[in-house]
């Protein structure tokens, strides 16, 4: 098909005007049209929530296909496999519809080919692309194409630990062992072992994996913060902060004296307030840093007088208490900040004093990390097993170092498209740069929805382009999709009201202005005052009803509040449970939520990713059983097994057995005591009665049989033997939640089987792997069971991204943000590198014996403090984006649920807004979502916000006030006169009969596979001939085949099959470098790269391969490598003559030469034969299929077909 030109700006403008003037019920927006049809430059589409970005992507792809672009010329990256599948499904429907609608024969044929090629199109995650890429080009780096992915976290942890200990030993015994010992002690903590260091090493490694070149970043950026440390500049910054903090305090005190303080005229604290004002008043702008530090010290000292109550307003008058509380709260905030600044003066002094020592420690750390990264890389190459990040690194390495590969992809891809661009990381960005020609990128995303920083996603990649394209349109086009087609005006107004007051460049990384605000566009949704967003607060009184210690036994106030609203929606408004979603920022409180919903009989469906598999009781029992089989001298595991339902020893029996110690031994394990009891070799043998002796004998016999069975058998077989011997699998199935328990046990056997298939063998290593997972405070994913159909959805905000629900409750608004990262011993930054806490040993100068002579002081390096500030801003920005994602999931109504003391919250005062935003300190001091929402509610009271708040107390949450779930009986009235059950059965039988008739009529279509390979449909092309007793290749054993009674060959010599030789020969022919002269030596080197056994390699005749390239066809291939295509996959749509149904044929062409008006197709065959005509007849149909596929793909009729026969001593090339 001839390419149709893309639209010009003027044509796009006319299309926009025509759409605006059309009578369509739901029109495309001008920006959507621009995003669909603009071409010829890099395009960044900033698509707000619900703005139809998937629609835009599909329409853009469809437009390009309709203009003659091939689906294989598009690189389309999605964030998840699910998103890729959905995109392909949409495209399939759209292309099929377009084929039916068009009368253009060329377009019909072109789109038909695209539909057939759709399964093989480059549409998927970056990981799926890099896997295919490395499978194809990995040989350039000596990577075998049969590599596997280390997806199992436990296996990955085992490998990491083994490599860590190897590198650890090398450094511990090496030349720099003194420096390394210092590094080890720096992270040892109370454990006094290597675990602290190991934890930081793995953390840094995960960070490095997101960079495009880990070793390069280590060498160039790891120490950057130490190299550019400027203490003079830091001192000046600190002085400015002290100045500002003192002026803020002065303003607060003066305002207080002029206003509220008049109510407390004779209060003692006011004298101290005046003292501080005098101290601050003595300063002027010209004073140096020493003067400001001195005043700060005196001010802080005054605040600490009278046990820290020198400035406290202690008024107890009821009517003045709110004023006093508000003053004390603000004063406390002010002095907390001043105290921190005072501490920073001392810290900065220590940082400067120990800068050299910390730098030396960091260099040692750099050396260790470099060795660990390289050793782990080599180990994974030995295993031929890689993480996804490794695959990406190798892909980048090939694209950077092999220009011919890079250029082939840049020429192939007409456009490089990426969805969810805001969640991209630096390694992925580098790959996209290499695949693009520099002006053909189409990037879709929304920085407000970037919530994967913990996976090393960097929203600044998106933000940098956003700012650059906005300021310099010649660098790229920025298109804004702001219209929201998902949510009601009530949801959007509430969302805008929150974020236009919360998010700016300073805190939030973007300014939530007209460019980012959501615009209501769903004309089908009419405004409804009942759907106004609600901020619901459980009124927690000062008695602490919600103390964590009570939550396990008492339903939380917030959940009773939520249940009341759910029942109201369900029973009063007829809302189905599946229309309601409960969103949480983490799963920490899920147990409380599930307990509450269960209590009221509300069905619930979770997101299925609770990682508590190893905590389930039935799995713990099995793990202890395996531990005992491996080593019965483990008392805890042995007791657990004996007490388990498999054997049922009670406390009395265990107590009797535990007293069976041999008299001549000081200490014995429980197992040794069991042996003594059996042998009656203890002075307490009288405690063992007959029934217990019998029970003990049975236990010991079974345990011995298991231990004996474990040696020659697989873990999988051992586990199932345990299940069957003691009926444990059946037992747990009869317990409450039995199917889920059985699924857990079944999964244990499967996981053990997977473990042994991943090059790890044996019970010992399996147990060690499990213990390491538990030691690292990890767990394995729980096993999913079928959820109820109509159920409330409970999921994390992260899981909800991309989904939508009519009614959304955002729970746990009061749950504090996770700040573990900022408390770590190490904080990393792309800009500054390593920030680390240095442990310094200091002399105390103490003379008395009871005082320590030295103390250890933890000193955060200057870079650590800088990285900490950077991390804090990035974390707060991400939390804002997380809240944005949660709020924009709602279609009709949004509920935000938290808790707090009404009295305390309403007495809270906040600094005035600045430029329509919350004060930056207010935003940065917030501990949770609720703090932000409440501050907005208070500061902007006069703005008539589009969400309301209300407190709900205990009196409104009694059992009677909440109500009960009304359950409708499945049985109707018992009156037989109205019983229509027989009619229903009759109707069902009629339907089944119709289905059977339909199935009979269309049986051929039903039995036809939707996808077939050339060998599967070869029967359509085989000539009819008398071949009784002869097995056709691939068709299975013929009925008349004779059974062989020859003695089996028990020799240890490795057997080589024809299939193995054929597969290895094909790979060899693919790998041969045709850019240089072929010799026997070069072929021998290439053969070494082929992934097969040496026995198979020995069977490949290289002289024969070399002889092929002396033939006319071989010479033609050698002379036209720029026209050569090898190992090319294809898909083709065909019609089954019997059923008249379409199916897809897929296969791989060994190779062909593509000329302007001719194609030369060739196929290698290693089958043994007597006459060439045998193979020609056998493969004529297969080559005919290949010919048809090439003809349809390139619209070329002149196709020459050759079989290259390698099954005899001499090579033969036969034209078919």
UniProtKB/Swiss-Prot annotation:
Chain segments annotated as coiled-coil in the UniProt record: none
Swiss-Prot/TrEMBL cofactor(s): Mg(2+)
Similarity annotation: Belongs to the helicase family. AddA subfamily.
GO biological process: double-strand break repair via homologous recombination
Job of this protein: The heterodimer acts as both an ATP-dependent DNA helicase and an ATP-dependent, dual-direction single-stranded exonuclease. Recognizes the chi site generating a DNA molecule suitable for the initiation of homologous recombination. The AddA nuclease domain is required for chi fragment generation; this subunit has the helicase and 3' -> 5' nuclease activities.
Entry superkingdom: Bacteria
GO CC terms, sorted: cytosol; DNA helicase complex
Signal peptide per UniProt: none
Catalysed reactions listed for this entry: Couples ATP hydrolysis with the unwinding of duplex DNA by translocating in the 3'-5' direction; ATP + H2O = ADP + phosphate + H(+)
EC identifiers of the protein: 3.1.-.-, 5.6.2.4
MF term (GO), any: double-stranded DNA binding
Cysteines paired by S-S bonds: none
PANTHER family: ATP-DEPENDENT HELICASE_NUCLEASE SUBUNIT A, UVRD / RECB / PCRA DNA HELICASE FAMILY MEMBER
Positions of the UvrD-like helicase ATP-binding domain: 26-488
PROSITE patterns per UniProt: UVRD_HELICASE_ATP_BIND, UVRD_HELICASE_CTER
Protein name, UniProt field: ATP-dependent helicase/nuclease subunit A
UvrD-like helicase C-terminal domain location: 515-802
Record key words, sorted: ATP-binding, DNA damage, DNA repair, DNA-binding, Exonuclease, Helicase, Hydrolase, Isomerase, Nuclease, Nucleotide-binding
Pfam family, one: UvrD-helicase
List of residues binding ATP: 47-54
UniProt subunit comment: Heterodimer of AddA and AddB/RexB.
Species name: Streptococcus pneumoniae serotype 19F (strain G54)
């Amino acid at each position: 098909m001839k390419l149709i030109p893309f639209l010009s700006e003027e044509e796009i403008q006319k299309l926009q005007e025509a759409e605006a003037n059309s009578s369509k019920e739901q029109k495309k927006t001008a920006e959507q049209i621009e995003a669909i049809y603009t071409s010829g430059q890099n395009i960044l589409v900033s698509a707000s929530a619900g703005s139809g970005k998937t629609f835009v992507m599909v329409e853009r792809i469809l437009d390009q296909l309709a203009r003659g672009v091939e689906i294989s010329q598009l690189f389309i990256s999605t964030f998840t496999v699910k998103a890729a599948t959905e995109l392909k499904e949409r495209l399939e429907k759209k292309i099929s519809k377009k084929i039916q609608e068009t009368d253009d024969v060329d377009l019909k044929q072109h789109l038909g080919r695209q539909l057939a090629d759709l399964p093989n199109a480059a549409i998927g995650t970056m990981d799926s692309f890099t896997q295919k890429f490395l499978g194809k080009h990995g040989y350039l780096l000596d990577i075998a194409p049969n590599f596997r992915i280390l997806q199992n976290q436990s296996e990955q942890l085992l490998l990491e630990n083994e490599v860590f200990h190897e590198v650890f030993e090398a450094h511990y015994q090496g030349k720099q062992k003194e420096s390394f010992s210092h590094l080890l002690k720096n992270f040892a903590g109370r454990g006094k072992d290597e675990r602290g260091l190991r934890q930081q090493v793995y953390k840094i490694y995960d960070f490095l994996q997101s960079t495009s070149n880990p070793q390069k970043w280590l060498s160039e950026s790891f120490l950057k913060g130490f190299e550019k440390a400027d203490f003079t500049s830091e001192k000046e910054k600190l002085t400015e902060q002290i100045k500002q903090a003192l002026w803020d305090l002065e303003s607060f005190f003066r305002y207080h004296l002029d206003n509220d303080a008049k109510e407390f005229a004779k209060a003692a604290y006011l004298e101290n307030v005046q003292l501080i004002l005098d101290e601050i008043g003595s300063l002027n702008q010209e004073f140096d840093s020493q003067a400001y530090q001195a005043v700060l010290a005196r001010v802080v000292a005054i605040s600490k007088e009278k046990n820290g109550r020198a400035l406290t307003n202690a008024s107890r008058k009821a009517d003045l208490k709110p004023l006093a509380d508000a003053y004390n709260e603000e004063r406390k905030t002010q002095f907390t900040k001043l105290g921190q600044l005072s501490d920073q003066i001392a810290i900065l002094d220590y940082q400067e004093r120990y800068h050299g020592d910390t730098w030396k420690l960091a260099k040692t750390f750099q050396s260790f990390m470099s060795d660990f990264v390289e050793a782990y890389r080599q180990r994974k190459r030995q295993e031929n097993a890689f993480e996804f990040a490794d695959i990406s690194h190798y892909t980048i390495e090939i694209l950077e170092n092999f220009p011919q590969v890079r250029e082939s992809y840049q020429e192939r891809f007409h456009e490089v498209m990426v969805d969810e661009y805001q969640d991209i990381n630096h390694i992925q960005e580098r790959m996209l740069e290499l695949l693009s020609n520099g002006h053909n990128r189409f990037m879709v995303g929304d920085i407000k929805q970037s919530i994967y920083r913990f996976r090393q996603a960097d929203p600044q990649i998106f933000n940098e382009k956003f700012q650059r394209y906005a300021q310099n349109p010649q660098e790229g086009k920025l298109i804004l999709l702001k219209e929201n087609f998902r949510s009601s005006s009530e949801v959007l107004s509430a969302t805008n009201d929150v974020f236009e007051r919360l998010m700016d460049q300073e805190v939030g990384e973007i300014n939530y202005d007209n460019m980012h605000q959501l615009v209501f566009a769903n004309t089908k949704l009419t405004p409804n005052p009942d759907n106004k967003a609600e901020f619901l607060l459980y009124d927690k009184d000062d008695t602490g009803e919600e103390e964590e210690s009570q939550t396990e036994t008492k339903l939380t106030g917030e959940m009773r509040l939520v249940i009341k609203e759910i029942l109201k929606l369900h029973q009063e408004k007829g809302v189905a449970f599946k229309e309601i979603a409960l969103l949480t920022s983490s799963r920490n409180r899920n147990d409380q939520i599930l307990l509450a919903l269960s209590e009221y009989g509300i069905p619930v469906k979770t997101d299925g990713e609770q990682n508590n598999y190893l905590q389930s009781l039935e799995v713990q029992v099995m793990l202890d059983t395996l531990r005992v089989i491996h080593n019965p001298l483990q008392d805890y595991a042995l007791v657990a097994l004996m007490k388990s339902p498999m054997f049922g020893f009670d406390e009395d029996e265990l107590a009797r057995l535990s007293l069976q110690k041999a008299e001549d031994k000081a200490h014995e394990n429980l197992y040794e005591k069991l042996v003594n009891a059996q042998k009656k070799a203890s002075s307490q043998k009288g405690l063992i009665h007959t029934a217990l002796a019998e029970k003990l004998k049975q236990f010991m016999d079974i345990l011995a049989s298991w231990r004996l069975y474990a040696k020659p058998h697989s873990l999988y077989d051992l586990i199932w033997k345990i299940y069957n011997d003691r009926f444990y699998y059946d037992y747990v199935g009869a317990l409450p939640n039995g199917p889920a328990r059985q699924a857990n046990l079944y999964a244990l056997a499967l996981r053990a089987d997977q473990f042994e298939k991943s090059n790890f063998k044996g019970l010992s290593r399996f147990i060690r792997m499990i213990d390491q997972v538990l030691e690292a405070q990890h767990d394995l994913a729980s096993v999913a069971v079928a959820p109820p159909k109509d159920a409330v959805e409970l999921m994390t905000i992260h899981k909800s991204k991309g989904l939508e629900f009519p009614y959304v409750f955002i729970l746990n608004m009061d749950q504090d943000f996770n700040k573990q990262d900022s408390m770590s011993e190490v904080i990393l930054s792309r800009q500054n590198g390593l920030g680390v806490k240095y442990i310094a040993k200091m002399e105390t100068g103490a003379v008395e014996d009871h005082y320590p002579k030295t103390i250890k002081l933890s000193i955060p390096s200057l870079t650590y403090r800088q990285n900490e500030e950077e991390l804090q801003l990035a974390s707060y920005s991400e939390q804002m984006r997380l809240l944005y994602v949660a709020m924009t999931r709602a279609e009709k109504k949004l509920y935000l649920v938290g808790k707090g003391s009404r009295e305390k919250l309403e007495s809270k005062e906040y600094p005035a807004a600045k430029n329509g935003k919350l004060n930056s300190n207010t935003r940065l001091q917030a501990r949770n979502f609720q703090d932000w929402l409440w501050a907005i509610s208070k500061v902007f009271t006069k703005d008539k916000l589009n969400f309301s708040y209300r407190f709900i107390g205990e009196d409104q949450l009694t059992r009677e006030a909440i109500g009960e779930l009304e359950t409708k009986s499945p049985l109707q009235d018992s009156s037989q006169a109205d019983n229509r059950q027989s009619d229903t059965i009759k109707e069902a039988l009629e339907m089944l009969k119709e289905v059977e008739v339909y199935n009979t009529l269309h049986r051929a279509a039903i039995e036809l596979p939707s996808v077939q390979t050339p060998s599967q449909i070869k029967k359509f092309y085989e000539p009819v001939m008398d071949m009784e007793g002869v097995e056709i290749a691939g068709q299975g054993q013929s009925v008349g085949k004779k059974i062989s009674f020859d003695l089996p060959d028990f020799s240890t010599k490795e057997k080589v099959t024809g299939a193995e030789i054929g597969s290895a020969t094909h790979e060899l022919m693919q790998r041969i470098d045709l850019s240089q002269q072929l010799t026997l030596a070069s072929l021998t080197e290439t053969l070494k790269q082929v992934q097969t056994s040496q026995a198979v390699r020995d069977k490949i005749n290289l002289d024969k391969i070399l002889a092929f390239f002396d033939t006319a066809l071989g010479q033609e291939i050698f002379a036209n490598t720029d026209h050569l295509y090898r190992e090319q996959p294809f898909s083709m749509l065909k019609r089954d003559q019997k059923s008249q149904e379409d199916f897809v044929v897929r296969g791989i062409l060994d190779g062909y030469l593509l000329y302007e008006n001719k194609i030369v197709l060739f196929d290698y065959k290693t089958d043994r034969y007597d006459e060439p005509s045998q193979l020609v007849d056998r493969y004529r149909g297969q080559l005919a299929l290949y010919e048809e596929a090439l003809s349809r793909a390139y619209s070329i009729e002149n196709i020459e077909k050759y079989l290259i026969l390698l099954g005899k001593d001499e090579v033969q090339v036969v034209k078919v």
